[in-house]
């Protein structure tokens, strides 16, 4: 980020990850589309509320659902699903956000996050759009690695439910859904499915629910296939891709298929403290 901020050389950089509002705005459409499909299929009545379950680390996709509700979409509950990096679960449970903890490498790496960037946008809303209060909390996060919201702010999170899935639970859910339904889900969607199961058992809520499946199993083939059966452990990467296609009856995506014969274009490796120098070298500045 420090490198991105260096504009003295005439270059302007932008981030394309989920902190960019350009990612959040199209994601709002997911939930409107899902609601429209439920209506079209006769699953719900017009105006009937639904729940949404989102596997998240950076709080982007679920924030898009929150914005969709603010635009009028009938959503009852936002179910926030975390992996073992459960900083969001702890936040919704206690009202304290604390990143001072061990970072866990999991099989759902897109959720391996301890600083959930988009949560700041939700904090701003529950602080009554108070920019000064928001800045105060974010300053505490930067200096102390944590902050705590007020009871009044916490009361505004009643529509949110947080829980998490362990690595073992994640793998077990992938296996169970495949065996029960013949459907293969990825490691992130499995976190969501696991947490939804916990939510149902805790609350008994039978509201029609949409689980956001945020990734393809082809992105995490080894973790997915190993969860289904240990016999796949010894297979090579592309053998696993072919096996996944067979058991899921889903064609290998072109982007994956092309990798088999594609030349390696980028082979630069550097230490994190050398990243800025490497970017400058590539740009010739």
Where are these regions (language model features)?
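Active-site-adjacent helical/loop segments in soluble small-molecule enzymes
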Residues: 8-42, 46-49, 125-203, 262-268
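Electropositive phosphate-/nucleotide-binding environments in soluble metabolic enzymes
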Residues: 21-29, 59, 112-116, 120, ...
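Catalytic phosphate/nucleotide-handling subdomain of diverse soluble enzymes
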Residues: 73-92, 194-261
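Non-catalytic terminal extensions of PLP-dependent enzymes
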Residues: 145-149, 234-285
């Amino acid at each position: 980020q420090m490198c991105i901020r260096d504009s003295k050389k005439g270059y302007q950089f932008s981030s394309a990850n989920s902190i960019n509002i350009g990612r959040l705005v199209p994601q709002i459409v997911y939930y409107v589309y899902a609601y429209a499909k439920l209506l079209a299929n006769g699953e719900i009545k017009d105006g009937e509320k639904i729940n949404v379950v989102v596997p998240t680390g950076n709080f982007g996709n679920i924030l898009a659902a929150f914005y969709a509700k603010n635009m009028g979409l009938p959503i009852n509950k936002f179910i926030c699903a975390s992996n073992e990096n459960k900083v969001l679960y702890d936040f919704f449970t206690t009202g304290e956000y604390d990143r001072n903890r061990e970072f866990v490498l999991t099989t759902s790496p897109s959720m391996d996050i301890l600083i959930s960037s988009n949560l700041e946008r939700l904090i701003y809303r529950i602080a009554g759009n108070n920019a000064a209060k928001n800045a105060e909390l974010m300053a505490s996060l930067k200096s102390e690695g944590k902050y705590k919201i007020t009871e009044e702010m916490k009361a505004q999170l009643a529509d949110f439910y947080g829980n998490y899935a362990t690595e073992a639970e994640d793998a077990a859910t992938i296996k169970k859904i495949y065996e029960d339904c013949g459907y293969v889900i990825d490691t992130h969607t499995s976190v969501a499915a696991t947490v939804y199961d916990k939510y149902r058992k805790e609350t008994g809520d039978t509201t029609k629910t949409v689980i956001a499946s945020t990734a393809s199993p082809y992105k995490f083939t080894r973790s997915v296939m190993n969860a289904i059966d240990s016999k796949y452990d010894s297979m090579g990467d592309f053998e696993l891709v072919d096996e996944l296609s067979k058991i899921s009856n889903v064609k290998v995506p072109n982007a994956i298929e092309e990798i088999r014969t594609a030349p390696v274009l980028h082979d630069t490796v550097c230490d994190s403290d050398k990243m800025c120098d490497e970017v400058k070298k590539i740009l010739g500045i």
